[in-house]
């Protein structure tokens, strides 16, 4: 991927080897007009390098599901579902809404064909999200689904779940919610993308965590023909699933409350005919939706950058 990105750029600078002061100088020396940072407050971020405002316009996008709180970042790219009108006061940045969705999904070229679990397989809910998202709110949301379908199982796939302490913690938390450890399958880590995606063949319906929804995991599940049920939350991180599903034309999988979440998820595995019909068309539905329309997304992103720059120019002339 690095090679592909480098080939598509007019210039490429390895900023990992630069300290914050050197990165500040590198941005200024190249006359960058609009700078987009993609990390926010995540590991390895370079927010301190922005402290002296090295570019006239600075935006944050995609990588962090909240305001950065950074005084030198002007704009934050979101959409009208993740950050509806009226939520502006939650952010230090001004919001740019890239409707219908703030991101675009590029399906992997080597993804296997979608496959349904066998007819004799028990109803299996699943999540391939990071284990740190499986906190109390998520377990409180998912446990009633498993109770509503007593013969069902839950498949969890997360890199850290292979660690004994993490695995034990997950099982203990579900146990406290009345879910026996024998109903939970911890799937093995896959060495490559194809192997990772192939494991969706073990899952009937995916469950979205809350309040920190899946993003790539949701898109991957849909691409592999697995419907994802999400709870519409009250902040960006808890509304990403809603944005993705509505953009894909799958608003029926968005639950307004916990009771509806249980009803939707349990209803899908109980109605095999409906589930088979839905799964058979999911990849095509996603492929035809704005969520995978890269050229259209590119135009929206371009137009947003241009609008931010023009706004700065107008203010500078005033």
Task: Name every feature range the model reports, one short phrase each.
Residues 100-192, 199-201:
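Conserved catalytic-core segment of nucleotide-activated headgroup transferases in glycan assembly
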Residues 25-28, 143, 147, 266, ...:
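Surface-exposed alpha-helical segments enriched in charged/polar residues
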Residues 79-141, 292, 298-317:
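Glycine-rich phosphate/pyrophosphate-binding loop
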Residues 178, 317-318:
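Short, flexible coil/linker elements and helix-boundary hinge sites characteristic
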Residues 1-72, 81-86, 154-274, 279-294:
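Conserved nucleotide-cofactor-binding alpha/beta core module
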């Amino acid at each position: 991927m690095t090679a592909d990105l480098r080939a598509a750029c007019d210039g490429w600078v390895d900023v990992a080897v630069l300290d914050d002061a050197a990165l500040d100088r590198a941005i200024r020396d190249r006359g960058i007009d609009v700078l987009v940072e993609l990390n926010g407050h995540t590991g390895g971020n370079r927010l301190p390098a922005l402290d002296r405002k090295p570019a006239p316009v600075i935006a944050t996008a995609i990588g962090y599901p909240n305001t950065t709180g950074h005084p030198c970042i002007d704009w934050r790219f979101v959409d009208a579902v993740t950050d509806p009108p009226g939520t502006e006061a939650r952010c230090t940045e001004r919001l740019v809404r890239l409707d219908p969705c703030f991101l675009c999904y590029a399906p992997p070229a080597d993804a296997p064909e979608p496959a349904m679990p066998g007819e004799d397989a028990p109803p299996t809910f699943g999540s391939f999200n990071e284990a740190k998202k499986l906190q109390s709110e998520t377990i409180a949301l998912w446990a009633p689904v498993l109770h509503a379908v007593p013969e069902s199982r839950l498949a969890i796939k997360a890199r850290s779940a292979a660690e004994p302490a993490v695995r034990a913690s997950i099982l203990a938390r579900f146990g406290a919610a009345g879910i026996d450890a024998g109903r939970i399958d911890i799937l093995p880590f896959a060495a490559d993308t194809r192997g990772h995606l192939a494991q969706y063949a073990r899952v009937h319906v995916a469950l979205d965590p809350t309040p920190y929804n899946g993003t790539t995991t949701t898109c991957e599940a849909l691409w592999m023909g697995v419907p994802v049920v999400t709870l519409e939350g009250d902040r960006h991180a808890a509304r990403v699933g809603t944005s993705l599903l509505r953009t894909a034309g799958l608003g029926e999988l968005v639950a307004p409350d916990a009771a509806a979440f249980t009803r939707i998820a349990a209803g899908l595995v109980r109605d095999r005919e409906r589930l088979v019909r839905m799964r058979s068309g999911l990849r095509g539905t996603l492929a035809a939706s704005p969520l995978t329309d890269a050229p259209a997304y590119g135009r929206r992103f371009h137009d947003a950058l241009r609008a931010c720059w023009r706004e700065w120019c107008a203010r500078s002339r005033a």
